[in-house]
Curated annotation (Swiss-Prot):
This is Large ribosomal subunit protein bL35. GO terms for molecular function: structural constituent of ribosome. InterPro entries: Ribosomal_bL35 (IPR001706), Ribosomal_bL35-like (IPR021137), Ribosomal_bL35_CS (IPR018265), Ribosomal_bL35_sf (IPR037229). Belongs to the bacterial ribosomal protein bL35 family. Pfam families: Ribosomal_L35p. Keywords: Ribonucleoprotein, Ribosomal protein.
Length: 67
């Protein structure tokens, strides 16, 4: 059986933690930030953990992991 390919969009957007969780960057911080307050910009600077329901789907798209 041939090797499974990883979805290229998953390679660009997600990282796996050592415990098996999936991290991603928070959306909404590329442009038009002048209309948002400092709290919004600060909170969107960090990475976030994907919910457990979507976790299974993303792991299926990256069968051999990403790290």
């Amino acid at each position: 059986m041939p090797k499974l390919k990883t979805k290229s969009g998953v390679k660009k957007r997600f990282k796996f933690t050592a415990n098996g969780k999936v991290k991603h960057g928070v959306a909404g911080k590329r442009h038009r930030l002048i209309s948002h307050n400092a709290k919004y910009i600060r909170q969107h600077r960090r990475t976030d953990v994907v919910s457990s329901t979507e976790n299974r789907t993303i792991k299926a798209w990256a069968p051999y992991g990403l790290n």
